[in-house]
């Protein structure tokens, strides 16, 4: 049995493991991780579909939310529309965060090839931060994306395990006569490409994937949307609450599916946190060893600016100058 090298137990080894990867590298690698997790979830959804109890034999479980809310079939379509709206709003917010970053580092506002009155100013102007301004603006867009995508990947990976472990009877009308999956590979690919909208899957009840992405958008705008405009918080909160109602009212998920997803998403987003180094170092361990998809050293980081530092050599007694790169924080 091989004995681990002594240096693994030394402080220097763990210091190297804690050294943050470049933010750009984290963006690329964690996005790749998210795609891999999406395929894992797609396979888990297929297994869950095959293991789902027969609706003709097993009836839906008692649910207080079902008893309090009148059933409105098809309301889940409105939840999908709300998710689409929040997707667009989050992309817009991320772009505005990028403009705040450019403003912080002294870059000018980008310009369109042709100036369109009103439109250019709305999209390309810097909306100066008025709330949550304790967050450093440098690289805020990159850090926000890393926080969002790592939280999403963790939640989907855990959901892949949970939906396979226990099979619940489907409460929605669409899964009372579940269709047969004829081409499993095609169904997996469609699940990833359409985020589940164009594939066949029933029985993936604990916990709600729709609620995960809704709550992620809610948390994203609660923290970062307020930096762009004060109205983003109340607007996204109302949209998210209405979407939760649509999910339960359409019987798309049990009420517990929604409540558990809300709790897990909020807890995960808070645990990942906002840090100038990107994701927590424990999560960076999973991508640190990759031989591709970005550099492993932060010696030259994005948006770094050279600073001249003079120091005196004690050995030679002469002054020398070196150019070092300011850390990208």
UniProtKB/Swiss-Prot annotation:
**Residue spans, topological domain Cytoplasmic:** 1-26, 96-147, 233, 279-329
Quickly give the catalysed reaction: an N-acylsphing-4-enine + a 1,2-diacyl-sn-glycero-3-phosphocholine = a sphingomyelin + a 1,2-diacyl-sn-glycerol
Tell me if Kinase is a UniProt keyword of this record: yes
Specify one Pfam family: PAP2_C
Enumerate the InterPro entries for this protein: Sphingomyelin_synth-like, Sphingomyelin_synth-like_dom
Name its cellular compartments.
Membrane
Task: State the protein's name.
Answer: Phosphatidylcholine:ceramide cholinephosphotransferase 3
Q: Which gene encodes it?
A: SLS3
